């Protein structure tokens, strides 16, 4: 059962900022492309069984997020009906 995957405006902006920051720290195009692919592959893998990642507890009981951890990023998302909405993408650390 396939889900539709969408980015929130905040998540889109965060991806752009991650790429801009990488470009400021390195000229290694391969590294930048690897990190972009890491985010893209992780996010679009959520189209199948997005419930596999744990719920991230917040102080607000109205909202819940699921938390996916990759090698370099933390991805927070929610599931509504058959749609996965990427809420935030956070860098774990920039070890270049």
Annotate each predicted stretch with a short phrase.
Residues 34, 55-59, 88:
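Solvent-exposed interaction patches of small proteins and small membrane subunits
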Residues 1-38:
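Arg/Lys-rich, positively charged N-terminal/basic patches that mediate binding to nucleic acids
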Residues 26, 66-74, 78-96:
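Enriched for short, Lys/Arg-rich terminal
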Residues 41-69:
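A short, surface-exposed loop/turn module that caps and links secondary-structure elements
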Residues 19, 40-43, 90:
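Conserved protein kinase catalytic domain
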């Amino acid at each position: 059962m396939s889900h539709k995957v969408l980015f929130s405006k905040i998540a889109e902006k965060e991806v752009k900022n991650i790429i801009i920051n990488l470009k400021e720290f390195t000229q290694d195009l391969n590294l930048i492309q690897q990190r972009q692919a890491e985010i893209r592959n992780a996010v679009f893998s959520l189209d199948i069984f997005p419930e596999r990642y744990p719920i991230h507890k917040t102080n607000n009981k109205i909202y819940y997020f699921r938390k996916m951890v990759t090698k370099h990023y933390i991805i927070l998302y929610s599931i509504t009906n058959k749609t996965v909405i990427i809420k935030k993408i956070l860098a774990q650390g920039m070890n270049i």
